[in-house]
Amino acid sequence: MTQLISVNSRSYRLSSAPTIVICVDGCEQEYINQAIQAGQAPFLAELTGFGTVLTGDCVVPSFTNPNNLSIVTGAPPSVHGICGNFFFDQETQEEVLMNDAKYLRAPTILAEMAKAGQLVAVVTAKDKLRNLLGHQLKGICFSAEKADQVNLEEHGVENILARVGMPVPSVYSADLSEFVFAAGLSLLTNERPDFMYLSTTDYVQHKHAPGTPEANAFYAMMDSYFKRYHEQGAIVAITADHGMNAKTDAIGRPNILFLQDLLDAQYGAQRTRVLLPITDPYVVHHGALGSYATVYLRDAVPQRDAIDFLAGIAGVEAVLTRSQACQRFELPEDRIGDLVVLGERLTVLGSAADKHDLSGLTVPLRSHGGVSEQKVPLIFNRKLVGLDSPGRLRNFDIIDLALNHLA
């Protein structure tokens, strides 16, 4: 009899075949299209025949932490609580990184699978995600970033550098993601986990547009690993945490709205607080600039007036109240500001100009965060069954689809 587990009000059938769910960070669908057109992704091209290729929506804000945690909980941020890479903790009155598992409000499917007796493995590119994804997980869990520190007691596996045959990659490199895939292949070949979650970094997508030689080479690398996983009998399910767009004008200059500077000029200093949830320890490739921001208002600043002021700025797509944003994007009310501001497709939002170091932006700015980066792929190496009319699909449906609806 098929064993079921229930997690966050959804049921999952435990698979008898190794299942690999892959989150390709920043995978705007055009990257795949261009790689296929260039003949660089033959395995992905074949999936239109024997697999399933769909499109879904990611969570907004379209950032790494909220979406990875939505995928592994099968639920939106209103359930699991992770609504950014960075947030303002109103209890401590401090701006803090959301990398600690203490901020997680829901169990993960990964941990519950392990409790049910499955061997579960998690490999992330950046170490910032490891504590969140590995929360209460008794299995294998490590990052490529700190692969030289992997040990049996803490990570469930050892000698990973020797097994993979690669040195520890730079966190700002395509090699960081390739290490994830190579480690996944080693685990599949040797330990053969029942379920594996692989999460990459979007360094390449931040630097290189779809169809460029660098982007096509990166997708060719991934395609070769997808094929090898398939040849070893694994169920392969691929999605993304968010898309990616250029955030520049016609000649490649960054389109940045420094909201804190604009609000200070309008209302005075210390009257508002702009918080950018894209902020994380790795800012070189995006300068902590994304298309989503939250704004906290002091008592003397009228909300309606602030909404009208922000909405009138060229490049702003929408301004929502806290309740509107939480309803539309399924966010936790106690962890966002009074207002949510969304940038248009070609525009990013900053705080104050002197708080952003743009020296690392050696190529035209590409970033994410808004609704313009919400469309992501849902790709499987099997046919879907039992979904005559799937309706709106989300990236956090991928584990349900991979375990409950594949032929």
UniProtKB/Swiss-Prot annotation:
Optimum pH is approximately 7.8. Keywords: Hydrolase, Metal-binding, Zinc. GO terms for molecular function: metal ion binding; phosphonoacetate hydrolase activity. Completely inhibited by EDTA and 1,10-phenanthroline. Moderately inhibited by the phosphonocarboxylic acids phosphonoformate and 3-phosphonopropionate and the phosphonate herbicide glyphosate. Partially inhibited by the reducing agents sodium sulfide and dithiotheitol and the chelating agent iminodiacetate. Nonphosphonate analogs of phosphonoacetate, such as arsonoacetate, sulfonoacetate and malonate are poor inhibitors. Inorganic phosphate, acetate and the known phosphonotase inhibitor phosphite have little effect on activity. Zn(2+) 1 binds at D25, T64, D241, H242. Its EC number is 3.11.1.2. Binds 2 Zn(2+) ions per subunit. Pfam families: Phosphodiest (PF01663). One of its GO terms (biological process) is phosphonoacetate metabolic process. Induction: By phosphonoacetate. It catalyses: phosphonoacetate + H2O = acetate + phosphate + H(+). InterPro entries: Alkaline_phosphatase_core_sf (IPR017850), Phosphodiest/P_Trfase (IPR002591), Phosphonoacetate_hydro (IPR012710), Phosphonoacetate_hydro_insert (IPR023116). Substrate binds at T64, D202, H242, H368. Optimum temperature is 37 degrees Celsius. Activity is rapidly lost after incubation for 30 minutes above 40 degrees Celsius. Zn(2+) 2 binds at D202, H206, H368. It comes from the Bacteria. PANTHER family: BIS(5'-ADENOSYL)-TRIPHOSPHATASE, ECTONUCLEOTIDE PYROPHOSPHATASE/PHOSPHODIESTERASE. Belongs to the alkaline phosphatase family. PhnA subfamily. Specifically hydrolyzes phosphonoacetate. Does not have activity on other organophosphonates or acetates. Homodimer. This is Phosphonoacetate hydrolase. The gene is phnA.
